Amino acid sequence: MQYLAAYALVALSGKTPSKADVQAVLKAAGVAVDASRVDAVFQEVEGKSFDALVAEGRTKLVGSGSAAPAGAVSTAGAGAGAVAEAKKEEPEEEEADDDMGFGLFD
């Protein structure tokens, strides 16, 4: 992911990304650069414009993003009783710690 992000940073700067540019970005971020991984990124994006890569990525995010809220709703409904019980217990703890023995504003 770091390698693709470095590629994107170079592309967003207005330059056509080169392997040297991507390696420079990675080194600036403190990443130990693996030349074979840089080569793999460039093989995957070969012949594609950056805009096409972004569009392809968005379709994948939409596909996986729509499933997440449905799962979150079902788990939130199942644990609602536990959340209510936890909220009931919290005020007791807060009341015991409010003064902490100082009594500055009595």
UniProtKB/Swiss-Prot annotation:
Which organism is the protein's source? Leishmania infantum
Instruction: Quote the biased-composition stretches of kind Acidic residues, using this chain's numbering.
Output: 91-100
GO cellular component terms, A-Z:
cytosolic large ribosomal subunit
PTMs per UniProt = Phosphorylated.
Q: Which UniProt keywords are listed? A: Phosphoprotein, Ribonucleoprotein, Ribosomal protein
Q: What does this protein do?
A: Plays an important role in the elongation step of protein synthesis.
Fetch the Pfam families from UniProt.
Ribosomal_60s
The answer to whether keyword Phosphoprotein applies is yes
The record's section on InterPro entries has: P1/P2_N_sf, Ribosomal_P1/P2, Ribosomal_P1/P2_euk, Ribosomal_P2
Q: How does it assemble?
A: P1 and P2 exist as dimers at the large ribosomal subunit.
Query: For the region Disordered, what residue ranges are annotated?
Result: 79-106
Q: Single GO molecular-function term?
A: structural constituent of ribosome
The molecule here is called Large ribosomal subunit protein P2
* PANTHER family the UniProt entry points to: 60S ACIDIC RIBOSOMAL PROTEIN FAMILY MEMBER (PTHR21141), ACIDIC RIBOSOMAL PROTEIN P2, PUTATIVE-RELATED (PTHR21141:SF58)
- GO BP annotations, alphabetical order: cytoplasmic translational elongation
